[in-house]
Amino acid sequence: MGDQIVVLGSGIIGLYTTYCLIYEAGCAPAKITIVAEFLPGDQSTLYTSPWAGGNFSCISPADDTTLAYDKFTYLNLFKIHKKLGGPECGLDNKPSTEYWDFYPGDEKVNSLKQYLKDFKVIPKSELPEGVEYGISYTTWNFNCPVFLQNMANFLNKRNVTIIRKHLTHISQAYLTVNTKVVFNCTGIGAADLGGVKDEKVYPTRGQVVVVRAPHIQENKMRWGKDYATYIIPRPYSNGELVLGGFLQKDNWTGNTFGFETDDIVSRTTSLLPKILDEPLHIIRVAAGLRPSRHGGPRIEAEVCEEGKLTIHNYGASGYGYQAGYGMSYEAVKLLVDNQKVKAKL
């Protein structure tokens, strides 16, 4: 059968990684197996990706590495958009406005203005009270549950095997003697997985309110020192609008709370009053645990017994959709560098 590759995890990072293996490194899909406890369509607090608001925003840190992951993802998502069949796949472009109660720094601003389509700095005279800086641009929006399912279906149809399996130790991901490489894309699970148990991994809890508001087709975000308010329309979702949110470090609670729902609705309708031009129809309230990591994402190759290779790719926190393609590209490059795979990188 030849050497086999296992991708451990089927959240957005695992799916991006599998896509990169095929389309950036030229690996044969039939030699790739995705192994995961949770698969697209599942709902669990420990399966973060379906709960995401789902857009490219300025939530990520301003270090050079993460900014590069963001840039790569933003500029290359059109490839996935095209291969998956256009906007119906759960990925589309929409206008976005972002405000900060503080200046986000030259490093972030100078990076963003290089590549964001339709990038404009909003004049101070047009900023809401208390806002220090604002920009507008055209972004990518995800319908996260739909996009995950379509990505998995796309890969499966190209002969990638997808297996539901709960593992307690990363060594179990080496399914056969032919499994030579494992990509560890376990997200929050990296905190407990035997052989990994990364003490730097922690949850950043969020709560969102999903409403029916087809008249809202723009993103609007406001970033404070200790809060985040965001309004994110889901493409091809029959008018779903995600309202958020919270960034609660080290909070493992998967429950939702009415007082947080009230706070989210208050903040988002103040930020974009026209949400209330139509009666507010709440579809669902959900909480998710962003897979954060002290020091940022771990993208690292680890040579194991008998020359087997584990490549870690996790810790994307709340920016997996917008930085994950770049992260996965970098992780796959580690395979190319270590195994000298014939590749297009």
UniProtKB/Swiss-Prot annotation:
Binding-site positions, (R)-lactate: Y230, R290
Positions that bind anthranilate: Y230, R290
GO BP annotations, alphabetical order: D-amino acid catabolic process; nitrogen utilization
Enzyme Commission numbers on file: 1.4.3.3
Gene: DAO1
Keyword terms of this UniProt record: FAD, Flavoprotein, Oxidoreductase, Peroxisome
UniProt-recorded name of the protein: D-amino-acid oxidase
Keyword Flavoprotein annotated: yes
Renumbered ranges of motif Microbody targeting signal: 343-345
Binding, FAD: S10, I13, S49, G53, N55, R290, S317, G320, Y321, Q322
Gene3D superfamilies assigned to the protein according to its UniProt record, in alphabetical order: D-Amino Acid Oxidase, subunit A, domain 2, NAD(P)-binding Rossmann-like Domain
Highest taxon of source: Eukaryota
Enzyme class label: oxidoreductase
Temperature notes for this entry: Optimum temperature is 50 degrees Celsius.
Role, per record: Catalyzes the oxidative deamination of D-amino acids with broad substrate specificity. Enables the organism to utilize D-amino acids as a source of nutrients. Enables the organism to utilize D-alanine as a nitrogen source, although it is not strictly required for this process. Also enables utilization of D-alanine as a carbon source.
Keyword Flavoprotein on entry: yes
Entry cofactors: FAD
Catalytic activity: a D-alpha-amino acid + O2 + H2O = a 2-oxocarboxylate + H2O2 + NH4(+); D-methionine + O2 + H2O = 4-methylsulfanyl-2-oxobutanoate + H2O2 + NH4(+)
